[in-house]
UniProtKB/Swiss-Prot annotation:
Protein species of origin: Polaromonas sp. (strain JS666 / ATCC BAA-500)
HAMAP family linked: Ribosomal_bL12 (MF_00368)
Protein name (Swiss-Prot/TrEMBL): Large ribosomal subunit protein bL12
Family affiliation: Belongs to the bacterial ribosomal protein bL12 family.
Record's keyword annotation contains Hydrolase: no
Coiled-coil region list: none
Subunit structure: Homodimer. Part of the ribosomal stalk of the 50S ribosomal subunit. Forms a multimeric L10(L12)X complex, where L10 forms an elongated spine to which 2 to 4 L12 dimers bind in a sequential fashion. Binds GTP-bound translation factors.
Keyword DNA-binding: no
Keywords: Ribonucleoprotein, Ribosomal protein
SUPFAM superfamilies: ClpS-like (SSF54736), Ribosomal protein L7/12, oligomerisation (N-terminal) domain (SSF48300)
GO MF, any single term: structural constituent of ribosome
Stated role: Forms part of the ribosomal stalk which helps the ribosome interact with GTP-bound translation factors. Is thus essential for accurate translation.
PANTHER family in alphabetical order: 39S RIBOSOMAL PROTEIN L12, LARGE RIBOSOMAL SUBUNIT PROTEIN BL12M
């Protein structure tokens, strides 16, 4: 029995949501495909914003918490920012705070590593 396109669409039109769900599952099993994979290309059409997010060149280095070795973290903050002792201590005590803003990726990674080596919890945004 051969189905033409119109007969197939008419049959689909008469199916309930549960029957359509079963049909989709059967197609996934039979042909080894996923319904989620079929939806992905449609989402890629609006990928301009996603591409811009992936190409981010400036990052904020955010100190989440100082950790156990607060003195080392204060020293690291002073090295990264050039702040005085009191300002660096206030920044560390006020965590979460931005240590560095709009830094290039290399500088942000270096600052993050230096702070993490001192015992701080750090995030790049």
């Amino acid at each position: 029995m051969a189905f033409d396109k119109d007969a197939f669409l008419t049959a689909l039109d008469s199916m309930t949501v549960l029957e359509l769900n079963d049909l989709v599952k059967a197609i996934e099993e039979k042909f080894g495909v996923s319904a989620a994979a079929m939806a992905a290309p449609a989402a890629a059409g609006g990928g301009g914003a996603a591409a811009a997010a992936e190409e981010k060149t400036e990052f904020n280095v955010v100190l989440l918490e100082a950790g156990a070795n607060k003195v080392s973290v204060i020293k690291a903050v002073r090295e990264i920012t050039g702040l005085g002792l009191k300002e660096a201590k206030d920044l560390v005590d006020g965590a979460p705070k931005n240590v560095k803003e709009a830094a290039p990726k290399a500088d942000a990674d270096a600052a993050k590593k230096k702070l993490e080596d001192a015992g701080a919890k750090v995030e790049l945004k």
